[in-house]
Amino acid sequence: MVFLNSSPFKGRLLFFVYLLIISTRLVAADMNTQYGCYLVDSSLTEQGTFTYLDPAYCYNNICGGSDNIAFVAIRNNQCYCGSTLTATEVSSSLCTTPCPGYGSLMCGGDLYWSVYLTGNGVLQTTVSSSSVSSTTSSSSSSSPSSSSTTTTTSPSSSSSSSSSSSSSSSSSSSSSSSSSSSSSSSSSSSSSSSSSSSSSSSSSSSSVPITSSTSSSHSSSSSSSSSSSSSSRPSSSSSFITTMSSSTFISTVTVTPSSSSSSTSSEVPSSTAALALNASKASNHTSLNAGAIVGIVIGCVAFAVVMALCIFLYFYFRRFKIRMSDSANEGKYPSYASELDSRLDPAMMNRKSSESLADSQDYSRKILRVTNLN
């Protein structure tokens, strides 16, 4: 004890703890490793786009580098960020689109997000109350008879029994309602009784206003009782942490309160409609880009063909005119015809006094020239 209380040992211990915290923070803040691949839904809002996008640029420049941001999600060149992740995780092999300019990093795909942790804030995963009820029912029906399940859910403003409880007879339904209301009143009367009930069912949960515990002695009865148990007291909290445990499975789930829990079996999650909408938008976006590229290529080819045709016609008609002019000049006398001997044309012959008279009978004879003998 004296050694532990010594000042040098305390200083070294604090220094070691400080180094451990710093190294953990640095490892957590490494955004070069993909945390997971998730299906695109409407839970996140696009913050911006960039041609050469990577996780660090998305966090620092587009999302502002806030300490409350726990993760960034990238879809092609679109940046998303937040602290609560509600999307469905899928296989990492579906996020195969490399980041532009960063071939070693993946940037999701047309319908998938690549999620990277920033090392700040607290990463939370949330599901709806109906999803937790259905998960509880399915896990109870598949678990052995000795297992038990404790589910902590947030109270909703209006609640009714689900499809499994409504399909039972009216007498069993009323008895189930009375038993659940008595359980609710007993759990709300004292927090110690609810905590003891939670510990006896071999499950641990965080402190919340209302806790409902269900033991599965048989698969069908466990499913009906777990799906029919609900609370009606309103709460101001927006989310609750639930821990479900069995002999081999432990999971922590944050439950989001829903406005109404009636007819949960016929309720369609909003993420499905959002997924279909995003898929149609992505297909339209891809088809528009492909159509624009094809149109540009066809336009360039057509312009080149028209220009080549115009050049060909120009030279063709030019040679045609030359040939036509040559053929038109073939029947005419040559231009040098007027340069012949004028004696062959008496009308054009010049009559000079110094020359002899022209012989109009025979042009083949020599023309005598008169000379002065004196």
Swiss-Prot record:
Q: Has UniProt tagged this entry with the keyword Transcription?
A: no
Q: Which domain of life is it from?
A: Eukaryota
The name this protein goes by in its record: Cell wall integrity and stress response component 1
Glycosylation sites recorded in the entry for this protein? 278, 284
- Which keywords has UniProt assigned to this entry? Glycoprotein, Membrane, Phosphoprotein, Signal, Transmembrane, Transmembrane helix
Q: Which residues lie on this side of the membrane: Extracellular?
A: 30-292
Question: Where do transmembrane segments lie in this chain?
Answer: 293-313
Per the UniProt entry, what species is this protein from, by scientific name? Schizosaccharomyces pombe (strain 972 / ATCC 24843)
